[in-house]
Amino acid sequence: IIYVGAMGDPFTENEHRGLYKSVDGGKNWKRILFSNNSSGIADLVMDPINPKKLFAALYQHKRTPYSFVSGGSGSGLFLSLDSGETWSKIGVNQGLPQGDLGRIGLAIAQSNPNRVYAKIEAKKNLLFRSDNGGTSWTVINSNPKFTNNRPFYFQDLAVDTQDEDRLYNIYQPLSVSYDGGKTFDPSPMIPADETKGIHADFHAMWINPKDPQHF
């Protein structure tokens, strides 16, 4: 089984956006989540113990030659408990912000799948946390230094594979929380003479599941 989250052509409204699923190794595909022709998938995470449980972040985003739209009614956080056959939208009743949302970054703890993080672009960019598998959410950090003022550009998160409280904020620079997102410290960086030619921005992170010091 393969899942692909597609943003589609960012310059046009089109039907190629959304979440797709293949059950035959990629030979055939079925779209299983879609909101509108301006919204695609910004992030997707799977419960490491229960692969039928998925969290998907839809993101309304459209480019123009000199600008872009980030956010709208097509954005949102969705939960499936049956491998994407049906979805429920997570919203205000579960603790998320009111109004239109933008880009959402997700991370689920391998050591405790009940711990899920979501960094959400809204009127005020906020870091949310769920400790019950996505049933309810609370704001864990509202400091703009870490929730950032460019959520359309930096919005990814990563969780230590053995410690649910160690959360990495993939930004500029990379920062790390040791208390489940409440506070962040700059992550020790590679010496400057070893990073020549490497751009300062961070957009993705892989953590070794057997050795979380290796990333």
Where are these regions (language model features)?
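Beta-propeller blade termini and top-face loops
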Residues: 1-215
